[in-house]
Every structure is written in structure tokens, then in C-alpha cells.
Amino acid sequence: MEEQKIQEKSLAHGAAPPLTAVERFLNGQKNEALCFKKQERSIDRPIVKTTRAIEIRNENKENMMFGPRKEKNLAVIGEIVVKGAAKDYTCKDITKKQPYKNIIKGQWTADEDRKLIKLVMQHGERKWAVISEKLEGRAGKQCRERWHNHLRPDIKKDSWSEEEERLLVEAHTRIGNKWAEIAKLIQGRTENSIKNHWNATKRRQNSKRKHKRSKNADSNSDIDDLSPSAKRPRILEDYIKNIENNDKNNGENIMTTSGNNVLSTSNYDQFNSEDSTSSLLDDPYDEELVFLKNIFENHSLENINLSQGTEITQSSSSGFMIENPKPKPNLYNNTFGTHLGAMVTEPANSSHLASDIYLSDLLNGTASSSSSLTFLSSNNNEHAGENELLLPQANSTSERREMDLIEMLSGSTQGSNIWFPLF
């Protein structure tokens, strides 16, 4: 009985009987499949969020404006099974920056100034995050600006001297309104003090212009000598005045130049419009008409010495040649006399257009000042082959008669030997 109990205990608590090769192979395949399934389940398991809150303070990455950063509500990600052991992995993501809730944005008190001076003496002028931690209600940026603009021991708070204003003017001509760069060139003057001095001088100058005194020059001089403004340097004030005057002059020049340009363009447009209208009215329709008009107006027989029997030839760019042969006196009636071949200029106030030059005499009537010439050929045997220039009979300047169509046709058929250009 005892031996059976011992064997049962050995079977229950002892090693299992040895396995055959087939059983070992099958058991190995099952174990590998089970391990692979467990790993997949552990990876696909959803993230388990816990209610545990972890606060982490990182002193190396401090926010200068909002103080040290606090990280809260970090959740634990689910467990991953690795080789039968469970390990916890915490989230390494950083939460959003949370500013201080109790930051004071008002003026600094004397107690805060004393504390800030002590902390700067202890930690130096660069560790503003550490100083802001020990100074409640103030951020690192506030401490830095308060120190550099107000509490620094080498700051000058007295009135500006002529030398300082001269340096300010020279720097402003080169740099402009870059007050931080100018503060580096003027020792003892901060950025705020330079900007405030500039704006105060500008306001003072504008107020003097608006409120002029109505007293005499002597009384004004006495008051100015007693006033503190008499001791104030005027270098910066004169410089600002020159800048404003230059700006005004530039604006006036721009206005005048723009006005002149407008006037000149308007005059130019008017001139062009007049030229265009005159060219439309005076532009002839044919070059031959202009050529004939110039000959009949500008050249008379007396000027070209036709009475002496010289032969004159006129030519033009259009190819017309006119020959004036030696005239023979007393060929016709004595009414012509020495006026044979004389050409009369066109009247100034003719109502015909430029295209009616050839028919101007017919349209305006025959007068002593008519410009049209009648070309006739004599069928007489004595003067065969000779072309003579004849004028119409002279009438009084006040008389004008109308010519009907028959007279026009009969006058044109008489000069059959003379050809006219086709228009």
C-alpha cells in the first residue's frame, strides 16, 4: 500500500514519463502556435487608460514666458507580453504648455523690485527662469525687461545732454528708428528712454506750433530765459523740424509735378485734336489739285517775267509739266491789254471744299478775284497750234452771276485741244 502511494505521489509531483519522438514534435508545434497567438492578441489589445496622474517637471526645458512646464494626466499604455513577462510602457508625449494662472501684469511694486535685485545678484543676468520661479507672479520675460529698462545700476535718469542728442541724431541718420541698435551706441540710455525722449521732443514741438504766445518778443525772451526749456538742448528738436520740412517739401513737389503733368497732357491732347481736325478739313483728295492750286496762287505771269517772252517750265512730283510760251500782244480785244496772261489769286473766303478747286469758279460765280483759269484753243489759222492762257472778262467785285449747266458744257467743249487730269 505504501509503495503504491509513493508511486502515485511520484507520478503526481514527479517528472512525466519520457515522450516519444512523434509526441515531442507535435507538442513543439502546438507551443509555437500558442505563443504566436498570444503575441498577436497583446499587440491588438486596445489601449487601457488609467486614472493615475503623473506630474513631471523638466527644469532643462523651461518656458521663459509662462514659467516652468508641468505635465499632467499621462496615461499608461496597455501591457505587451514579451517572453512570458509583462512590462509597462508610459507615454512619452508632452502635453500642451500651461501658463501660470496667477501672473501679475500690472506695475511693479518696490518690494518686487528689491526681490528682483537680490535674485539677480545671486543668479546673474541670464537665469531668468530660475529667478521667475522664486519671484511669484512674474514671468521670466517680465523680470528681464524690468531689470534692463529700470533696475540696471548704470542707467542714466537725468536730462539729456547735447553730446547724447548729437549721438542720437547721428545714429538716427544712419540706422533710422531702430531704437535697440541706437541704445547700444549711447551708454547709459535704454531703448525705452531713447524712444520716449524722441516722442516727447516731437510732441513738445507740435504743441509750440499750436499754442503760440501773444506777448511781445521782449517778454517772451525773459520768460524763456527763466523757464527750464531754455536750458534744454535743441539739437534733436532742430533735427526733427528739418525732417518734417523735408517731408512737406517732397509732398508739395509731388503735387506740383503731377499738376504740371496733367496740364501738359491736356494741352498736348488739345493740340493733337486741333491738328487732326485741321488735317481732316485741309487734306486734299488728290495731289494734282494741290499742284494746280499752288501754281495758280503763288506764281503770276508778272513774277515769272512772262511778258518778256521767256519760256518757263514748271514741274511737280506728280509728273505734270506746264510750258508757258511767248505771248503775242494785241491778239484779242483791247480789254485784256497788258493784263494778258495775268493770274488772279483765289479769294480768301471761298465756300467750296478742297475737292472743288477745279470747279470753284463755277460754284462761286465769275468775279475779278476768281482763281479758275479757262483754257481755250484758237481755231484761227494765224494762231494754230498755240495755246493761250486767257482770263474771263473782268466784272465788278460786287457782281456775281450764276452759270447754268449749258454754259459749263459749252465752255468745256471749246478747249478740246487741252486735256485735264481725271480726278
Curated annotation (Swiss-Prot):
UniProtKB keywords: DNA-binding, Nucleus, Repeat, Transcription, Transcription regulation
Which tissues is this protein detected in according to the database? Answer: Expressed in ovary septum.
What more does the entry say?
The gain-of-function mutant upd10-D (T-DNA tagging) is infertile.
What is the protein's species of origin?
Answer: Arabidopsis thaliana
Report domain HTH myb-type positions: 100-155, 156-206
List, alphabetically, the Pfam families matched.
Myb_DNA-bind_6
**Superkingdom in the source lineage:** Eukaryota
In its UniProt entry, what is this protein called? Transcription factor MYB64
Residues covered by region (Disordered): 193-230
Q: Can you name a GO cellular component term?
A: nucleus
Per the record, the coiled-coil ranges are: none
GO MF annotations in UniProt: DNA binding; DNA-binding transcription factor activity
Gene Ontology biological-process annotations:
regulation of cell division
